[in-house]
Structures are given as structure tokens and as C-alpha cells.
From Swiss-Prot:
Keywords: Cell membrane, Glycosyltransferase, Membrane, Nodulation, Transferase. GO terms for biological process: extracellular matrix assembly; hyaluronan biosynthetic process. It is a peripheral membrane protein. GO terms for molecular function: hyaluronan synthase activity. The gene is nodC. The lineage of its organism: Bacteria, Pseudomonadati, Pseudomonadota, Alphaproteobacteria, Hyphomicrobiales. It is found in: Cell membrane. This is N-acetylglucosaminyltransferase.
């Protein structure tokens, strides 16, 4: 009986110790990073920053929501080449989206593709990917607002040859508004 109690105590203690080490490592790794230091680290390491194509499929999106999304992409602090491909997937409210498209059509980083009819999100993404030429492709939903350093952070992660894909942490803007989002 004493052997069983001792073994159990050792197992519980070991688990507690290993869990503490693991959680500490997670907390340390998850500390916010300074985006300018990420770019400086990449540049000092002689890394040529890859070109990034951001694809934004949209369908019947609210014009203000789409405008906020595109503004957040336009304001990225990424030092490399950034292109944005917006695919309107046959929206019925194109007359309302026209002014948003017009604003960004004059920005050489932006390309607007107007699909003749709704073909679905996946096919809209495929249309954007086929017209992309970037080293990396970032897919962004049309109702997403990116922090200014998102592209820089994702590119930094993609410099590791063992990494094949990277994604950001999503934070719902309405997370405190309703019981569904709390």
C-alpha cells in the first residue's frame, strides 16, 4: 500500500512540475513581439522579404465592413511587397460596394476582381490565387480587421523551413456584446 501511495505521489508531483514548466514555456513564447524588431531581425539576417498577396473574397458584404477590412490591410507595416486581391463574388449590392472598390482601385497594390455571378467562397479564393504571384498568400475574410503588424508577424513565422502555414489569432470585435460572443 505504501508503494502505491508513493508511486501515486511521485506521478502527481511529476505531472505538476512538468505542467508548470510547459505552461511557463507557453507564456514566455506567447509574449507580444515588437513588429519593427521582427523586420529588423529579418533584414539583419540577410533575409529578402517575400512578396505577400492578400486575398479577400467577399459576397454581399456591408460597404463599411469591407472598407474597414481593406483599410486595415492598406495600413500594414510590412516592409516587403504587398498586393491585395479583392474578389467580389457576384454581390447583389455592388452598387453600394462600388465606392469602396473605386477607392482601392486607384491604389496600385490593390486589384478588384468582379465575378459575373456568385460561385461560392472557395471558387472566389481560387480565382484570387490564380491571379496571385506572391511568394506567400494570406487569406482574409472581408469582415476581418487586421492589426498593423499581422503580415510582418506571419512572414516572420514563415521564415522557419519547418513551418508550412501560419495563422493569426482571431479576436472577435463583438466578443463582449452578446451572450453568444462572451
Amino acid at each position: 500500500m505504501d508503494l502505491l501511495a508513493t508511486t501515486s505521489a511521485v506521478a502527481v508531483s511529476s505531472y505538476a512540475l512538468l505542467s508548470t514548466i510547459y505552461k511557463s514555456a507557453q507564456a514566455l513564447y506567447a509574449q507580444p513581439t515588437n513588429p519593427s524588431s521582427l523586420q529588423n531581425d529579418l533584414e539583419q539576417a540577410g533575409v529578402v522579404l517575400p512578396s505577400v498577396d492578400v486575398i479577400v473574397p467577399c459576397f454581399n458584404e456591408d460597404p463599411n465592413t469591407l472598407s474597414e477590412c481593406l483599410a486595415s490591410i492598406a495600413s500594414q507595416d510590412y516592409a516587403g511587397k504587398l498586393r491585395v486581391i479583392v474578389v467580389d463574388d457576384g454581390s447583389a449590392n455592388r452598387d453600394l460596394l462600388g465606392p469602396v472598390h473605386k477607392i482601392y482601385a486607384s491604389d496600385p497594390r490593390f486589384r478588384i476582381i468582379l465575378m459575373a455571378k456568385n460561385v461560392g467562397k472557395r471558387k472566389a479564393q481560387i480565382a484570387a490565387i490564380r491571379s496571385s504571384s506572391g511568394d506567400l498568400v494570406l487569406n482574409v475574410d472581408s469582415d476581418t480587421i487586421l492589426a498593423v503588424d499581422v503580415v510582418t508577424k506571419l512572414v516572420s513565422k514563415m521564415q522557419d523551413p519547418d513551418v508550412g502555414a501560419a495563422m493569426g489569432q482571431l479576436v472577435a470585435s463583438n466578443r463582449n456584446e452578446t451572450w453568444l460572443t462572451k
